[in-house]
């Protein structure tokens, strides 16, 4: 039951076959074909110069190919499958525990698959497909060009995603940088960054970043820089950064192109909106709640809703509703409701209700209700006035406490 054909070929396994110079078939039912080929495992096949199949029912095809693991498969020059069920396909590809010497390699590398030049899958249930990928995290996989994965349960689909130590994560795209041994991250896009403290980060876009836990960045160049913050839109920024000096800016939300929410629980919605302090709300294109970053976040609570509402304002406890309402105003406790209401005010606790009401005021505690009411009130005796009606109380410099009607 032995067949040996070739110079110095030997066939010692039951029903084994050796064909070629210095071939050796020592495993039962094994086949060795090629110069120096060796089939030692039962039912194994070695095909190619210096090919070696040591594991039971293993297959080695190619020059200097080696299969050590039981039921393992190696195909390609220098390929090596060294653990049970491992598959290595491609030039110098490696699947399984590289230190294994026999077909019983243990847990590491079992059911590993490596396909591609220099690909390595060296942990249990791993997949490495592509040139130079190295996967050593249990249950992880890399598909594409050189990426190294050491974290467990992590997959990378794309090229040049560096070394990923994060566990239970997914990276889909190219040139992404996942720093540190984080977990639960999801990245879709190119050239994105997840910092070392950012567990459970979500990025969808290009050139975006998350630098704190549970952050979300969606959109080109979006950035989530504080815990639980959400940035949605081109160049959107949510979190403590870009000059903010107080607070942690947790749970901030910025939605819209160039929007910025830099305070704790701040909300900025709309193109170019800015909510720079804690619990501030800015809604509407270019709406703002104050640019002064030298005052403690805890002292500033502003709300601006409307196109350019509160833009250029400086103060605290102000509320502006309407297009251009409260624009370029300075002071505390002011309220303006209506188109351009309360615009260019310097003073405190003023109230303007109606289109163009309460504009250009340099005084405090005035109330203007109606179209154009309470415009151009000055501090020279012009405080604490009430103007009700269209055009009422314009250009007032009268005594304190007047009630002015048209």
How does the language model describe each region?
Residues 1-406:
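Glycine- and small/polar-enriched repetitive beta-structure motifs of secreted/surface proteins
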């Amino acid at each position: 039951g032995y067949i040996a054909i070739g110079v110095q070929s030997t066939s010692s396994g039951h029903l084994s076959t050796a064909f070629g110079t210095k071939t050796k078939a020592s495993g039962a039912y094994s086949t060795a074909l090629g110069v120096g080929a060796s089939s030692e495992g039962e039912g194994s096949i070695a095909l190619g110069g210096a090919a070696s199949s040591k594991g039971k029912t293993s297959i080695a095809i190619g020059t200097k190919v080696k299969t050590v693991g039981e039921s393992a498969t190696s195909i390609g020059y220098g390929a090596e499958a060294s653990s049970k069920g491992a598959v290595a396909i491609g030039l110098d590809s490696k699947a399984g525990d590289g230190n294994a010497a026999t077909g019983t390699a243990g847990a590491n590398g079992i059911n590993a698959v490596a396909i591609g030049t220099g690909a390595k899958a060296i942990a249990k249930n791993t997949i490495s497909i592509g040139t130079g990928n190295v996967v050593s995290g249990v249950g992880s996989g890399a598909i594409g060009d050189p990426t190294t994965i050491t974290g467990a349960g992590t997959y990378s689909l794309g090229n040049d995603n560096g070394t990923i130590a994060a566990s239970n994560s997914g990276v889909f795209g190219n040139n992404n940088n996942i720093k540190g041994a984080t977990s639960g991250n999801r990245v879709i896009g190119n050239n994105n960054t997840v910092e070392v403290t950012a567990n459970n980060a979500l990025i969808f876009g290009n050139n975006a970043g998350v630098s704190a836990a549970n952050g979300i960045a969606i959109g080109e160049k979006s950035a989530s820089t504080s815990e639980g913050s959400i940035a949605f839109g081109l160049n959107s920024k949510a979190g403590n950064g870009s000059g903010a000096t107080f607070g942690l800016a947790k749970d901030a939300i910025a939605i819209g192109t160039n929007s910025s929410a830099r305070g704790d629980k701040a909300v900025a919605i709309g193109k170019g909106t800015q909510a720079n302090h804690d619990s501030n709300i800015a809604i509407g294109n270019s709406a703002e709640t104050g640019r002064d970053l030298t005052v403690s976040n805890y002292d500033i609570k502003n709300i601006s809703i409307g196109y350019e509402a509160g833009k250029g304002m400086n103060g605290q406890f102000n509320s502006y509703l309407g297009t251009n309402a409260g624009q370029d105003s300075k002071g505390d406790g002011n309220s303006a409701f209506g188109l351009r209401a309360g615009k260019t005010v310097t003073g405190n606790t003023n109230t303007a209700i109606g289109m163009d009401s309460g504009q250009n005021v340099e005084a405090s505690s005035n109330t203007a209700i109606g179209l154009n009411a309470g415009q151009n009130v000055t501090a020279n005796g012009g405080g604490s006035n009430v103007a009700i009606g269209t055009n009422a109380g314009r250009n007032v410099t009268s005594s304190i406490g007047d009630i002015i009607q048209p």
